[in-house]
Structures are given as structure tokens and as C-alpha cells.
Amino acid sequence: MKLWVGLGNPEPGMARNRHNIGFMAIDVIADRHGFAPWRKRFSGLVSEGSVGGEKIVALKPLTYMNESGRAVQPASAFFKLPPDAVTVFHDELDLIPGKVRVKRGGGAAGHNGLRSIDRTLGTQDYWRVRLGIGHPGDKARVHGHVLGNFAKTDEDWLVDTLEAVSDAAPLLAAGKPEDFMTKVALLTKDTA
């Protein structure tokens, strides 16, 4: 069993924010892989299903981004999961839009959702699926960028990326992050 967490903010008006791409990815995975209906649990929304034969618990924290760990920690403790069974899908400023990278461990790089999870799990040794949203170029514009909505011109690459992540998800569930990244890249090569 694995816990896959999509990061985002729960306000309906923030649903299309760049910061919510983690929620979007988990929603597409749960939908396309036939997960059970979402229900409230662990200060979040939870859905269970199977990806590539692996049982997955999907979690969308309703704690707001900066307190995501308040949902992740109790969920991982309840299911008795070690940190390396947790995968967090999140927005990544340092990747161009549509680029996807997976890594285990590492710092929060200024991402408050990751910082909260690091603090509550007591470790950084969990998996991250970094979903590129691009950098606005000026550090002073970062806050407005991540909390801004995706533009209509982003729609093609965004939909293609989210569908590719879902289509490649069985490789991620099987513990093959390199193969997952390769498949996502191949599926999005004309749009990212």
C-alpha cells in the first residue's frame, strides 16, 4: 500500500491556481483509475483504488498548503506506512511548465507544503513528483505566480501533462520512477 498526496488549497476559487497542480494530478489519477468516491478523513479528502495492481490511498489535504503535514502524518501513521511509501505531487517553480521529475528526499526549496510535511513526518525521506509550473523570473513575483490561475494558453500542456502522469502512474506505483519520468516525457513531447 502507498499513500499518494496531492498538494493544493481547498478554496473553490483557488482550484485553477498553479499551486493546486498537485490536487489536479491526484484528481486525474483517481478518476482515470476508477478510485472510490472521495470522503473526508485525516483533515483531507481520501479516495482508495488500485494503480497497476498496487493499492493506493489518495489524499488531498484540506488544511491549506502551509499545513499539509497535518493531514499527511495522521494518514501515514494510520496505515503504518514508512516515509518511502509516501509520494507527494506538488508544483515546482524550478521546472519549466509541463516538465515532471521524481525524486526521493531533499529539501523543501521554499515550498511551504513540503516544509510542513517534513516537519510532521520528522523526515524528508519521502517521494516527490515535481510538476513544473515555471518561474516568473523575479523572486518578488513568485507569490502571485503560484497563487495565480493557469492561463488559457496553458491548457494544452496542462491537460496533456496531467493525463500523461495518470497514464504513467502504474510505473510509479511499481517503484520505477525513471521509467515513469521517461513515459511522461514521451507522452508529452509535443506539448511541453
From Swiss-Prot:
GO CC annotations, alphabetized: cytoplasm
Chain coiled-coil ranges: none
Site, Discriminates between blocked and unblocked aminoacyl-tRNA: residue positions: 9
One Gene Ontology biological process: protein quality control for misfolded or incompletely synthesized proteins
Pfam families xrefs: Pept_tRNA_hydro
Subunit note: Monomer.
Job of this protein: Hydrolyzes ribosome-free peptidyl-tRNAs (with 1 or more amino acids incorporated), which drop off the ribosome during protein synthesis, or as a result of ribosome stalling.
Protein name from the UniProt record: Peptidyl-tRNA hydrolase
Species this protein is from: Acidiphilium cryptum (strain JF-5)
